[in-house]
Curated annotation (Swiss-Prot):
Organism: Caenorhabditis elegans
Main location: membrane
UniProt keywords, alphabetically: Membrane, Transmembrane, Transmembrane helix
Family statement drawn from the similarity comment of this UniProt entry: Belongs to the nematode receptor-like protein srg family.
UniProt keyword Amino-acid biosynthesis, yes or no: no
UniProt-listed GO biological process terms: sensory perception of chemical stimulus
Name recorded for this polypeptide: Serpentine receptor class gamma-11
Topology term for the membrane: Multi-pass membrane protein
InterPro entries associated with the record: 7TM_GPCR_serpentine_rcpt_Srg, Nematode_SR-like
Source domain of life: Eukaryota
Length: 335
């Protein structure tokens, strides 16, 4: 299907489009239903994890830099899922398109903000990923100093997670955002004021850096854990599951961001657009599921709502951690 090309002389011109009626309504609505069926539970799970870590059981998790970083990821993931639910409804719930299309001919302020927040959040995800893998690596390399080493600069690092992505928002802020026909519905697009400053290329830079950090840090983690005694192999297996998932997710993201960055004219309105949306779903929905599976203590707190910990569940202060046992405790806490 050819790309939609708006023909305007200034940013205030009306952009008129028609919904594509070639798509089967039943098929498109089924796509919408299937995606909403996992996006809503995924959003709820992110909120539950965020609430458990920061509020309900904060006395347990507030001493773990890993969980504080991960709670930031839960917040960003929920924000993206919330916006994605709106976006997927516009794209796939095709009966709405002919009804609401005339509402989107004029310049879009609300959806421009939505698009900025969505791209900003995607960059945040890459930065959070870097913090998570570096945090885990430092945990196994410096088990004694790990806690103090992270807690001091952590609040500044989290602030930077939200501040740094503003460096790539500027072109989107000054550009015209409009709706274009996408599948049987509509979706947001923008007319770049600065031609070279593509959001997809900016995102590709962030994601590629995050992927490199993931590969290097997890390689160091695996090498270090292999050196541990045999009785600690269960920890290695659990960590392998999480890191393998993260690596796979970012490889998928890199592939789709590469296609959009350099072949956007070909792929913007094709099926690959839908796959690119799903690639972020893998991160936003899959990540809390993985965390829910690998951390039995966190899972119990989320599901059972218990505020009390047995001695085995309590986070061990860094000052009390010694020798190999301390190493294991810190690794288990971060998982």
């Amino acid at each position: 299907m050819p790309s939609f090309r708006p023909n305007i002389s200034n940013d205030l011109d009306t952009i008129i489009f028609e919904c594509n009626s070639n798509y089967d309504t039943i098929v498109e609505v089924t796509k919408w239903f299937l995606q909403i069926a996992y996006l809503i539970p995924g959003g709820i799970l992110n909120i539950l994890l965020l609430y458990t870590i920061l509020f309900k059981n904060s006395e347990i998790y507030a001493s773990s830099s890993f969980f504080l970083i991960y709670s930031t990821d839960c917040f960003v993931s929920f924000s993206m899922i919330f916006l994605d639910i709106i976006g997927r409804t516009l794209v796939y719930f095709t009966p709405l398109c002919p009804i609401i299309a005339p509402m989107f001919y004029e310049p879009l302020i609300g959806f421009k903000i939505m698009m900025i927040v969505l791209h900003h959040s995607r960059a945040c995800k890459s930065l959070i990923q870097i913090l998570l893998v570096v945090n885990r690596m430092s945990c196994v390399i410096y088990p004694i100093r790990y806690g103090k080493m992270w807690m001091r600069p952590l609040k500044y690092l989290i602030i930077l997670v939200f501040v740094i992505p503003f460096s790539i928002d500027w072109n989107l802020i000054i550009s015209r955002v409009y709706m274009q026909p996408t599948f049987g519905g509509i979706y947001m697009e923008y007319i770049k004021k600065v031609a070279w400053a593509s959001q997809s290329r900016f995102q590709l830079i962030f994601i590629t850096i995050a992927l490199l950090f993931t590969i290097v840090c997890t390689s160091v983690i695996f090498y270090t854990l292999v050196m541990l005694p045999k009785r600690l192999r269960n920890v290695e297996r659990t960590l392998s599951l999480g890191t393998a998932y993260i690596s796979m997710s970012f490889i998928i993201l890199v592939v789709f961001q590469f296609l959009f960055a350099f072949y956007s004219d070909i792929f913007t309105t094709s099926t690959i657009f839908g796959y690119s949306l799903l690639s972020y779903d893998i991160l936003n929905v899959g990540s809390p599921i993985i965390m829910h599976c690998v951390s039995s203590k966190l899972r119990n707190h989320v599901l059972r709502g218990s505020r009390k910990l047995s001695s085995a569940a309590r986070v061990v202060p860094v000052s009390n951690v010694t020798s190999t046992n301390g190493w294991v405790n810190l690794i288990v806490i971060t998982l």
